[in-house]
Protein backbone atom coordinates (compact mmCIF):
# COMPACT_ATOMS: atom_id res chain seq x y z
CA UNK A 1 0.00 0.00 0.00
CA UNK A 2 1.39 3.42 -0.92
CA UNK A 3 0.43 6.80 0.51
CA UNK A 4 1.30 10.01 -1.27
CA UNK A 5 1.76 13.32 0.53
CA UNK A 6 3.14 16.72 -0.37
CA UNK A 7 6.51 17.54 1.09
CA UNK A 8 6.49 20.39 3.59
CA UNK A 9 10.17 21.11 2.96
CA UNK A 10 9.92 20.98 -0.85
CA UNK A 11 6.41 22.21 -1.79
CA UNK A 12 6.53 20.90 -5.37
CA UNK A 13 7.62 17.41 -4.34
CA UNK A 14 5.31 14.49 -3.61
CA UNK A 15 6.52 11.90 -1.13
CA UNK A 16 5.46 8.30 -1.35
CA UNK A 17 5.26 6.25 1.82
CA UNK A 18 5.08 2.51 1.24
CA UNK A 19 3.36 0.47 3.95
CA UNK A 20 4.53 -3.13 3.95
CA UNK A 21 3.12 -6.10 5.80
CA UNK A 22 4.47 -9.61 6.06
CA UNK A 23 1.40 -11.79 5.75
CA UNK A 24 3.23 -15.12 6.03
CA UNK A 25 3.99 -14.79 9.73
CA UNK A 26 0.87 -15.65 11.67
CA UNK A 27 2.08 -16.11 15.25
CA UNK A 28 4.21 -13.58 17.13
CA UNK A 29 7.44 -14.61 18.80
CA UNK A 30 6.60 -12.68 21.97
CA UNK A 31 3.27 -12.29 23.69
CA UNK A 32 0.95 -9.54 22.44
CA UNK A 33 0.92 -6.64 24.91
CA UNK A 34 -1.69 -4.10 25.98
CA UNK A 35 -0.61 -0.49 25.77
CA UNK A 36 -2.30 2.65 27.07
CA UNK A 37 -3.55 4.93 24.31
CA UNK A 38 -5.15 8.34 24.57
CA UNK A 39 -6.37 10.90 22.09
CA UNK A 40 -8.25 14.20 22.21
CA UNK A 41 -11.93 14.10 21.30
CA UNK A 42 -14.33 17.02 21.72
CA UNK A 43 -12.11 18.81 24.22
CA UNK A 44 -11.62 15.67 26.31
CA UNK A 45 -8.85 13.14 26.52
CA UNK A 46 -10.15 9.68 25.70
CA UNK A 47 -8.10 6.86 27.19
CA UNK A 48 -8.13 3.19 26.35
CA UNK A 49 -5.82 0.22 25.92
CA UNK A 50 -4.87 -1.26 22.59
CA UNK A 51 -3.21 -4.56 21.81
CA UNK A 52 0.03 -4.54 19.91
CA UNK A 53 3.28 -6.33 19.37
CA UNK A 54 6.06 -6.21 21.92
CA UNK A 55 8.57 -3.48 21.01
CA UNK A 56 11.44 -5.99 20.99
CA UNK A 57 9.65 -8.15 18.46
CA UNK A 58 8.95 -5.18 16.21
CA UNK A 59 12.57 -4.07 16.41
CA UNK A 60 13.77 -7.64 15.78
CA UNK A 61 11.78 -7.71 12.55
CA UNK A 62 13.08 -4.22 11.72
CA UNK A 63 16.59 -5.55 12.23
CA UNK A 64 15.81 -8.44 9.88
CA UNK A 65 14.54 -5.93 7.31
CA UNK A 66 17.81 -4.00 7.50
CA UNK A 67 19.71 -7.27 7.02
CA UNK A 68 17.66 -8.22 3.94
CA UNK A 69 17.11 -4.90 2.14
CA UNK A 70 18.61 -1.44 1.75
CA UNK A 71 16.26 1.15 3.25
CA UNK A 72 17.55 3.93 5.48
CA UNK A 73 14.34 3.95 7.49
CA UNK A 74 15.29 0.61 9.03
CA UNK A 75 18.47 2.09 10.52
CA UNK A 76 16.60 5.21 11.62
CA UNK A 77 13.92 3.18 13.42
CA UNK A 78 16.47 1.03 15.26
CA UNK A 79 18.59 4.03 16.21
CA UNK A 80 15.59 6.09 17.34
CA UNK A 81 14.24 3.23 19.46
CA UNK A 82 17.62 2.64 21.09
CA UNK A 83 18.26 6.31 21.84
CA UNK A 84 14.96 8.22 22.03
CA UNK A 85 12.18 5.76 22.82
CA UNK A 86 10.08 6.54 25.90
CA UNK A 87 9.67 2.76 26.20
CA UNK A 88 12.93 1.22 27.43
CA UNK A 89 14.34 -1.36 25.04
CA UNK A 90 16.65 -4.26 25.77
CA UNK A 91 19.09 -4.88 22.91
CA UNK A 92 19.47 -8.56 23.90
CA UNK A 93 15.69 -9.05 23.55
CA UNK A 94 15.80 -7.43 20.10
CA UNK A 95 18.57 -9.84 19.07
CA UNK A 96 16.54 -12.81 20.39
CA UNK A 97 13.54 -11.82 18.25
CA UNK A 98 15.77 -11.19 15.22
CA UNK A 99 17.35 -14.63 15.56
CA UNK A 100 13.94 -16.25 16.04
CA UNK A 101 12.68 -14.94 12.70
CA UNK A 102 15.89 -15.81 10.87
CA UNK A 103 15.66 -19.34 12.26
CA UNK A 104 12.09 -19.62 10.93
CA UNK A 105 13.44 -18.70 7.49
CA UNK A 106 16.37 -21.11 7.78
CA UNK A 107 18.82 -18.18 7.69
CA UNK A 108 21.68 -17.13 9.96
CA UNK A 109 23.44 -13.82 10.45
CA UNK A 110 26.79 -13.48 12.15
CA UNK A 111 28.09 -10.24 13.58
CA UNK A 112 30.75 -9.66 10.91
CA UNK A 113 28.32 -10.36 8.06
CA UNK A 114 25.67 -7.97 9.39
CA UNK A 115 28.20 -5.23 10.15
CA UNK A 116 29.56 -5.65 6.61
CA UNK A 117 26.05 -5.27 5.17
CA UNK A 118 25.42 -2.14 7.24
CA UNK A 119 28.81 -0.68 6.25
CA UNK A 120 27.89 -1.19 2.58
CA UNK A 121 24.48 0.41 3.16
CA UNK A 122 26.17 3.43 4.76
CA UNK A 123 28.22 3.98 1.57
CA UNK A 124 25.00 4.32 -0.43
CA UNK A 125 23.75 7.90 -0.87
CA UNK A 126 20.12 6.80 -1.24
CA UNK A 127 20.26 4.76 1.97
CA UNK A 128 21.70 7.73 3.85
CA UNK A 129 19.26 10.30 2.49
CA UNK A 130 15.87 8.56 2.24
CA UNK A 131 14.71 9.62 5.71
CA UNK A 132 15.55 13.31 5.43
CA UNK A 133 12.38 14.39 3.57
CA UNK A 134 10.23 12.54 6.11
CA UNK A 135 11.66 14.09 9.27
CA UNK A 136 10.43 17.23 10.97
CA UNK A 137 12.84 20.10 10.53
CA UNK A 138 13.67 20.10 14.27
CA UNK A 139 14.93 16.49 14.18
CA UNK A 140 18.63 16.13 13.50
CA UNK A 141 19.64 12.74 12.14
CA UNK A 142 23.08 11.60 11.00
CA UNK A 143 22.98 8.12 9.41
CA UNK A 144 26.73 7.62 9.90
CA UNK A 145 26.46 8.32 13.65
CA UNK A 146 23.33 6.13 13.81
CA UNK A 147 25.18 3.30 12.09
CA UNK A 148 28.07 3.57 14.52
CA UNK A 149 25.68 3.53 17.48
CA UNK A 150 23.63 0.57 16.21
CA UNK A 151 26.81 -1.42 15.52
CA UNK A 152 28.17 -0.74 19.01
CA UNK A 153 24.96 -1.25 20.99
CA UNK A 154 23.07 -3.85 18.97
CA UNK A 155 25.02 -5.64 16.24
CA UNK A 156 27.97 -6.33 18.54
CA UNK A 157 25.62 -8.58 20.54
CA UNK A 158 25.25 -10.96 17.59
CA UNK A 159 27.23 -14.19 17.73
CA UNK A 160 30.58 -14.07 15.93
Regions found by a protein language model. Give the residues of each.
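Structured mid-to-C-terminal alpha-helical surface segments
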Residues: 1-160
